[in-house]
């Protein structure tokens, strides 16, 4: 491609504009640390400015049509507890990005295996919360992160946006649901409940809004904004409850299996779902319900997590969850823990 002097000048100007925007927004964030509403507004303004200058992704070219065979199924990816920004002896933001990319590549690989028997043209993604680590969840957290909350937000948005765009290259349609986690709390508080701001304002929801706006041009993508602490995911006749899991209290340093089952047995009576998906406890588990459905607890991306080792006595092996769903019969037909 022939590049003119004008192209070089325009590119340099775009870089200069982006650098100026970054400096200005970082200055706004520093002056807004004590004022949560201003901090949130600064994040939104930074996202809009960056999108205006750098642009948003053009519509992804759909995959080539495949020869139809078998009864179609749907890939369901539970991507949760990515904790971008957290640092352990074997985990940081760069590792988080690598593991998200690995999750997507393994999802595509396992889908192609399924496609040898039947069509899998649609993918549903559940973003299960705790997308970032943030810096104000507990007192010493500033010593266990590699980026500010502001930087974590935009790293998470960039990483997850890239993941969704990759899925759009492989699936005819993609659908995304989001649920907020306790690490999304804005300001002081306990768990997900903030003392400084209403609970609807949550870093996970803000990340979701940034990504949703940036992917607005993707006509094959259905983006479901988070309206509550949970989402109901519908895949044909299959209906699932998705939530982070932090509403279920644990005591004595153990994963509260009884509490998990008890809560879901109550919720199913008026939410009417087959299965449930949650994270939060950083350990894999599945529990049966009386209605014949199951509760799937998905691990996190974090390895060597002090929380998992000290609080729930779990090994903290990084993994995510991929299921395949028969939308006509309303049931899961194949289950994978995607080890990372």
Which residues does each predicted region cover?
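Basic, amphipathic N-terminal segments that precede the first structured/catalytic domain
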Residues: 1-117, 326-328, 339-340
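Conserved beta-sheet core of the metallophosphoesterase superfamily
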Residues: 168, 197-205, 210-228, 236-339
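Active-site metal-binding loops of divalent metal-dependent hydrolases
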Residues: 80-82, 129-131, 181-184, 245-247, ...
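Acidic carboxylate-rich catalytic motifs and surrounding loops in phosphoryl-/glycosyl-chemistry enzymes
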Residues: 174-182, 222-231
